[in-house]
Amino acid sequence: MVNNFSQAEAVELCYKNVNESCIKTPYSPGPRSILYAVLGFGAVLAAFGNLLVMIAILHFKQLHTPTNFLIASLACADFLVGVTVMPFSTVRSVESCWYFGDSYCKFHTCFDTSFCFASLFHLCCISVDRYIAVTDPLTYPTKFTVSVSGICIVLSWFFSVTYSFSIFYTGANEEGIEELVVALTCVGGCQAPLNQNWVLLCFLLFFIPNVAMVFIYSKIFLVAKHQARKIESTASQAQSSSESYKERVAKRERKAAKTLGIAMAAFLVSWLPYLVDAVIDAYMNFITPPYVYEILVWCVYYNSAMNPLIYAFFYQWFGKAIKLIVSGKVLRTDSSTTNLFSEEVETD
């Protein structure tokens, strides 16, 4: 009798004295602090890193290009993940409980899905933009205009938000797995299981665009390699020691394609394990251990923090823009016309 009582006392609940409360599986103080630091850092990096990207592109007139507007909108999606999703997921992952109410649980799930699919669709648009820029640079300015970029942005957001909210607010994700949903439902939990059909659809919505992007970037790099060889073969015949304007533009476009290709690859590597696991779970009665699932989810979340780091490493203009923003010199009246592509930018 005493033994049974001690076992009952050992079980922690998310909400004490509440019927049907979820069971809490707390970490010891050391690992708990480390998890909060690591996961919280990801949220801060995603929020502030992508905020810097948006400010840089929207403030500096030299960056007002169709490609950069797509990048700014992509950064907006990742910024929203860092603000509306990751902080709450941090608490849920560390405390193993959801303390933010049922209403925001549903919003959180919709935000999570919407912003992540928005990132995917933006990357698809960017890959098409880079393909045209590298393979047909002469007509690129007339083919992929700011208006075309705007249409891509609107459609990416519209389909992402419509798809996500229609799934979770109609209950379509729960059809056929009602017993599982009842078994998982408890006070302090926030699960949104998907049935097999929706999991398969989500996987295809991820897989098909990514296969297309891999194909497009492969074509881009083949063309870029051919262009580089052509420039090298004609370099000795050049009358001027300095590069021609056309060559400089071609180099810039190839570098942009390479950088954005790396961003696409990072997205693929971050997402693929999670989606493969989701498909396996849907067809094998959700066999994934909770800690494995948490690791896969946070690999996806951390992708939202990676793009600013990629830009900072490969884009010289982004580093210069950050210096101007952080130093406060961006507040000067003429700062928006700063030449970020010159060898040296006046920052004094």
UniProtKB/Swiss-Prot annotation:
Database matches in PROSITE patterns: G_PROTEIN_RECEP_F1_1 (PS00237), G_PROTEIN_RECEP_F1_2 (PS50262)
Cytoplasmic topological segments: 59-68, 129-148, 219-256, 315-348
Ranges annotated as spanning the membrane: 34-58, 69-90, 106-128, 149-170, 197-218, 257-280, 294-314
InterPro entries assigned: GPCR_Rhodpsn, GPCR_Rhodpsn_7TM, TAAR, TAAR_fam
Entry-linked Pfam families: 7tm_1
Major localization class: membrane
Sites where the protein binds spermidine: D112, T113
Extracellular Loop 2 (ECL2): region residues: 174-187
Topology class, membrane: Multi-pass membrane protein
Localization terms from the record: Cell membrane
Record Gene3D superfamilies: Rhodopsin 7-helix transmembrane proteins
Disulfide cross-links: C22-C186, C105-C190
Coiled coil: none
GO biological process, alphabetically ordered: adenylate cyclase-activating G protein-coupled receptor signaling pathway; G protein-coupled receptor signaling pathway; sensory perception of smell
Glycosylated residues, chain numbering: N4, N19
Keywords: Cell membrane, Disulfide bond, G-protein coupled receptor, Glycoprotein, Membrane, Receptor, Transducer, Transmembrane, Transmembrane helix
GO cellular component: plasma membrane
Gene Ontology MF annotations: G protein-coupled receptor activity; trace-amine receptor activity
Extracellular side: 1-33, 91-105, 171-196, 281-293
Family membership: Belongs to the G-protein coupled receptor 1 family.
Swiss-Prot/TrEMBL domain comment: In addition to the well known disulfide bond common to G-protein coupled receptor 1 family, trace amine-associated receptors (TAARs) contain an unique disulfide bond (Cys-22-Cys-186) connecting the N-terminus to the extracellular Loop 2 (ECL2), which is required for agonist-induced receptor activation.
Its job: Olfactory receptor specific for trace amines, such as N,N-dimethylcyclohexylamine (DMCHA) and beta-phenylethylamine (beta-PEA). In contrast to mouse and rat orthologs, not activated by triethylamine, cadaverine (CAD) or spermidine. Trace amine compounds are enriched in animal body fluids and act on trace amine-associated receptors (TAARs) to elicit both intraspecific and interspecific innate behaviors. Trace amine-binding causes a conformation change that triggers signaling via G(s)-class of G alpha proteins (GNAL or GNAS).
Protein name (Swiss-Prot/TrEMBL): Trace amine-associated receptor 9
